[in-house]
Amino acid sequence: FNWLATMWGGTIRFTTAMMFACGFICLFVLGGFGGLILALVAVDFTLTDTYFVVGHFHMVLVGGSVMLLFAMTYYWWPKMTGYMMSEKLGKWVFWLMFLGVFVTFFAMHLSGANGMARRVPVYFADFKFSNYLTTIGYAM
């Protein structure tokens, strides 16, 4: 957690790049908690081949790579090109992306914990709401 120690005691300005970096930490840690749950043998046996594993993998992957790519772009683009990007628009992009990623993959965690299997052509009607939440989050 050296990322948090770097910010400790500092004067933090929440620019768009910093918001994407903090969003990375939040999504990476929340997705990582899913990995801790999957480390338990009995739970892993139950949740294997469910959407819980898909939600865990993608929350860590998207939270880890895409958020940092956006942070890097917002930080380095003005330094490379000499043109500033809109902070207001960047913060809108951050919040829409952060909430979209969280809603999409957290709904997958809940679906998988309730038994929604992967690689099935037709799902039970019980999972209609969680699939709807996943679609809404994806559309964000």
Show which residues each predicted segment covers.
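Active-site-adjacent structural elements in folded domains
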Residues: 45-47
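Hydrophobic cores of alpha-helical transmembrane segments in multi-pass integral membrane proteins
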Residues: 1-5, 16-42, 51-82, 86-140
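Short amphipathic alpha-helical coupling elements at transmembrane boundaries
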Residues: 6-10
